[in-house]
Amino acid sequence: MSDLPAVVVGLSGGVDSSVAIASLKAQGHPVVGLTLWLMKGKGQCCSEGLVDAARLCEQLGVPHHIVDSREIFEKYIVNYLISGYANGVTPLPCSQCNRLVKFGPMLAYSREQLGIDYIATGHYAQVKYNPTSDRYELWRAVDRHKDQSYFLYDLPQEILAHVLFPLGQQTKAETRALAAQYGLPTASKPESQDLCLIEAHGSMRQFLDQYLPRQQGEIVDVYGRVLGYHQGIHHYTIGQRKGLGIAAPEPLYVVALDREHNRVIVGDRATAGRRECTVARVNWVSIPPPKEPMTATVQIRYRTPPVPVTIIPDANAEQVQLEFAEPQFGVTPGQAAVWYAGDRLLGGGIIQPFGTPTLHPLEATATHV
C-alpha cells in the first residue's frame, strides 16, 4: 500500500488534466477522478468532456465521480457575468470559478464524501510552502507561456495547503509527450482556446444577447461628437479596437462605457492610458497583508506583460491603489490585477470602475461626423 496521500484529481476531459491524474498514479498516489458538470444544456464541457473523463478513468482503472455543479455555476458565474456586463464592466469569470465553483467545492467533496485531503488539477502553476512565513506560496509555472497563476490568485491558504499542480514544472510539449507515453486517449485532443461559455454559445456576444436586451446608444469621442451607434454597451470592453462599427482617420479604442447615458466613449491610444486604478476584493497569497506601500510588477490582463507598479494598501489591505510607473493601456474594470515579485504571486484583486471621463465639446465642430 502506498505511503503517498490519496488525491482527487479534477478532470475536464482535456490532455492537461489527463496527464495530471496519470502522472500522480505513476508516482504511486492513489487517485480518484472527479468531473464537475457545469453547464445546463448541450455544450462541449458538459457532454464531451464528461465522456472523455469517464473513458480515461476506465482506461486507468481508477474511480470516477461526477458532481452536478450546474446550480452553483449558474449562481456564481452566469449571473456574475450578466450582472457585470449589464453594469458596464468586463468580468473575469475564471478566477471566480476557480475559487467558488471548482477548488472550494472539490476540496469539500473530497473530504466529506471520500475522506481525501488533497486535490489536484491540470493547471500550470506551482505551490511552494515557506516555513519561515508559514504560508503556501503560489508561483508561476516553469512554462511561462502556459502559466495560469493569474487565474488562481483568489485561492485562499486553506485551499493552497491541499492542492497539487503536477504540471507546474513541465512544458506543454512535455505534457503532450507524456500523454502519448501513457497511451492516453486525449493525447492528440486539440487544446481549448476559449471560455467554456464561449465554446458552448459561439461567442460572448451571443451568450450575453440571450440575457441582456439590445439597447441602441451613441458611440462618441472624448469631445462628445457622435461617431456612430451601438446595440448595447455589453458588446464592448475597455481597450477594444476591432468591431466598433465606426469610420475614423485614426485608430480609435474604447476608453469608457457610460452606463448612465448608454454611451460608448472612444479615443486614441494615448487617451486610453491610465496611470492608476483602485483594486478591491484583494487576496494576499504569498505574503501577509502589508501595512505600507510596496513595489512589485503587475499584470492587468492574462496575456499582458508584467509592468512596474507601486501598491498602496488601505487600512486593512482589502483594497489597494495601484500607481503604474508608465501609463497603461487597457486597464479594465472587472478584470483582475495580479502582482508578483519575480515569479512569486503576491496577491491580486478586481479593478474597480473609475468613473466616466468628462467630455470636452469642440464649439466649432459639428455634433456628427
From Swiss-Prot:
Disulfide bonds join C97-C196. It comes from the Bacteria. InterPro entries: MnmA-like (IPR004506), MnmA-like_C (IPR046885), MnmA-like_central (IPR046884), MnmA-like_central_sf (IPR023382), Rossmann-like_a/b/a_fold (IPR014729). One of its GO terms (molecular function) is ATP binding. GO terms for biological process: tRNA wobble position uridine thiolation. The keyword DNA-binding does not apply. It holds the Pfam family tRNA_Me_trans_M. One of its GO terms (cellular component) is cytoplasm. Catalyzes the 2-thiolation of uridine at the wobble position (U34) of tRNA, leading to the formation of s(2)U34. Belongs to the MnmA/TRMU family. This is tRNA-specific 2-thiouridylase MnmA. It comes from Thermosynechococcus vestitus (strain NIES-2133 / IAM M-273 / BP-1). The lineage of its organism: Bacteria, Bacillati, Cyanobacteriota, Cyanophyceae, Acaryochloridales.
